[in-house]
Every structure is written in C-alpha cells, then in structure tokens.
C-alpha cells in the first residue's frame, strides 16, 4: 500500500513538473523563513553570550519627565541623566548589580599617523562587565577603580583591534577616540547587533567623558539607560517596589520636575 502511494506521488510529480517545482520551492522557502524567524527570536530573547543573564534582568530604556504636579499626558520622553541613574537605580539594594549604558554613538578610532576606523561606542561602568559575559581575547575589562577615577581606558572588539593593529593581542596599547588618547584594557570577541543591550565595538567608562554634564530639565534627562540584574527572577517585584520608592524620594528632591517610568523596569530593552 505504501509503495502504491509513492508510485502515485511520483506519477503526479512527473505529470505537472512546473507546478511540482513551484510547490517544492515555495514550501522550502516558507520553512526557511520560519527557521530564520525562530533563530532571530531565540538570539534576542533567550540567555546567550554576552547577554547570559536575560532571564533575571530588568531594563529601563527611557523615562518621562513632567512639571511637578502636572498630568502624565503633558510630559516628555527621553533617556535618563547620569544623576537620575545613580540616584534612582544605582542605589538599589535589592538588585545584584546595576549598570548605566549610553546609546551607541559613532566614534573615530585611530592610531597617530596610522590606521583609523569608525566604530560604535557606548559609555558604561564596571558593573556592565558583571552583568554581561564577554569572551576576552586579550587583557581584561576596566575595573571599578578605573571607572570611579574616570581613567581613559577602553575595551575594543576583535574586528576593531584587527583593523587597527592586525592582531587582537593589543592590551596595554594606546588608541585615539575622536583624537583623545585611551589605553586599551582588553579586547573581546565581536558582538552581534542582535544583542541590543550589550552591543558595541568600543566600550569606555562614562566617567572618562563629560556625559554626566550633558543633562537638562533639572539634570534629570540625559543619554543613559539602566540594566538591572536580579539575584533571581523572583526578586523582580521587590526591585520594582524599591525603584518606585527611590523615584518618589528623587522627585521630592527636585524643585520643579517629576520623573516616572511608564511601567518600567520591564523585561525588554
């Protein structure tokens, strides 16, 4: 019986070859597209290097600010300032770690009278390297002491290091970021752009620049985002509750403004 089914199928395939090939190619293309979508969603949602802690991470990608006593509808949406990030999120005691991360920006990475490349750079702090797990090919991440002191040091991706030096073994050497000298503390394997909260090609301490002074609206608004690492997902409610308490305390210290997060921290960056 099964043999008869195969014979009938082959007969119909030979009888209409054009329809057969269209059907086969259409089915293959549909399966391929579904596989691509599934893999893309997996890469963006499940724990994978360097975002190995997605399942216990919370994010604040933006916030809102309004005049004190005003309605939520009469507000502006923006990134947070370094000051807001420090007082409202870096002060969390229920979290394992909190990092502030700027949006990626284009930067000129160069050697004096040598090679140069344009790369995506983010400004962050030492906690970034605790929350995200990178594979270091040379050197190491900048430390808390480097971050606190504003030391001009940088971590490069492998692609940038190779473009400049021809190798990834460059820890301790110096590069220029927009013509400002930075010491290379380490080199990491390249990161996919799908790792939206960790992606960059150059990472530096935000304390080594003037980004903290780029703030307005009573210094509440700036260019930073926050990533919060919980000890477990069960701590999410406690973290959100403490974040709300810190928000109210912060608002009490402001003269004319109030900040609010529109449902954040949440689990999507």
What does each model-found stretch correspond to?
Residues 61-62, 78-141, 256-262:
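Short amphipathic beta-strand/extended segments in non-transmembrane regions
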Residues 13-16, 23, 44, 58-62, ...:
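Generic structural signal for small/hydrophobic residues in well-ordered secondary structure
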Residues 74-75, 147, 253:
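Coil residues (strongly favoring Ser/Thr
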Residues 2-14, 84-88:
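A short amphipathic helical element positioned immediately N-terminal to and/or at the very start
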Residues 15-45:
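Short, strongly hydrophobic transmembrane alpha-helices
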């Amino acid at each position: 019986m099964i043999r008869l089914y195969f014979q009938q199928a082959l007969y119909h395939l030979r009888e209409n070859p054009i329809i057969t090939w269209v059907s086969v190619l259409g089915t293959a293309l549909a399966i391929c597209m579904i596989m691509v979508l599934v893999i893309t969603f997996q890469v963006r949602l499940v724990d994978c290097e360097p975002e190995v802690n997605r399942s216990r991470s919370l994010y604040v990608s933006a916030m809102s600010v309004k005049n004190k006593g005003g309605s939520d509808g009469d507000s502006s949406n923006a990134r947070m300032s370094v000051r807001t990030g420090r007082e409202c999120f870096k002060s969390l005691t229920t979290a394992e770690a909190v990092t502030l991360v700027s949006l990626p920006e284009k930067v000129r990475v160069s050697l004096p009278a040598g090679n140069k490349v344009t790369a995506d750079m983010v400004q962050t702090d030492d906690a970034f390297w605790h929350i995200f797990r990178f594979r270091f090919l040379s050197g190491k991440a900048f430390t808390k002491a480097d971050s606190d002191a504003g030391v001009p040091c940088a971590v490069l991706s492998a692609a940038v290091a190779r473009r400049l030096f021809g190798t990834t073994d460059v820890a301790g050497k110096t590069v220029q970021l927009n013509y400002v000298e930075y010491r290379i503390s380490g080199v990491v394997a390249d990161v996919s752009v799908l790792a939206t909260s960790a992606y960059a090609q150059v990472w530096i301490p935000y304390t080594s620049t003037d980004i903290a002074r780029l703030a307005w609206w009573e210094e509440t608004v700036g260019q930073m985002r926050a990533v919060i690492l919980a000890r477990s997902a069960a701590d999410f409610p406690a973290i959100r509750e403490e974040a709300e308490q810190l928000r109210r305390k912060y608002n009490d210290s402001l003269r004319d403004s109030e900040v609010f997060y529109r449902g954040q921290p949440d689990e999507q960056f």
